[in-house]
Amino acid sequence: MPAWLADGRTLAGLDLGDKTIGVAVSDRGFAFAHPRPVIMRRKFSLDAAVLLALLKKENVGAVAIGLPINMDGSEGPRAQKSRAFVRNMAQLSDLPFVFWDERLSTVAAERTLIEMDFSRAKRAGKIDSAAAAFILQGVLDRLQSLDSAARTELGGRTEPGPTDAA
């Protein structure tokens, strides 16, 4: 894992909506995404202050933000808003932000909440954080598969040995 994910750090996932920011945070083992309460959007400076305080409290080392790519692979206005949000956050924090294709994450999150028998009213308050958890879980699963592949390439070792040198 990169140094910015060492020392008990976690990862955060964000799902940006027009009215809320869905937030999820990983466990320290980078296996599970846990939804957190949504941040109600007011204006960027206030939203950023609330978000940065939460990221600090949760000991976050990096942030995955959902990038709403259209089904044809193009980027529309919502993707541009997400990119602008990250550009603005980069001026306030040195945390690394990475984009993650969030296609259908809200649909998957809503299906899960329906299966859990949440009423429409309860789903409305949780959908963005559930979508953030889906985004983050995708990142965590990818990290796990990359870590597993690296261990396989290294013959089960976690560090390169003398025969692995180029």
Curated annotation (Swiss-Prot):
The superkingdom listed in its UniProt entry is: Bacteria
Task: Tell me the compartments it is located in.
Answer: Cytoplasm
Q: Give the transmembrane ranges.
A: none
Q: What GO biological process terms are annotated to this protein in UniProt?
A: rRNA 5'-end processing
Q: What is its main location?
A: cytoplasm
Molecular function as annotated in GO: nuclease activity
EC number(s) given by UniProt: 3.1.-.-
Q: What does this protein do?
A: Could be a nuclease involved in processing of the 5'-end of pre-16S rRNA.
Q: Family membership, please give it.
A: Belongs to the YqgF nuclease family.
Q: What is the designated name of this protein?
A: Putative pre-16S rRNA nuclease
Q: Which organism encodes this protein?
A: Mesorhizobium japonicum (strain LMG 29417 / CECT 9101 / MAFF 303099) (Mesorhizobium loti (strain MAFF 303099))
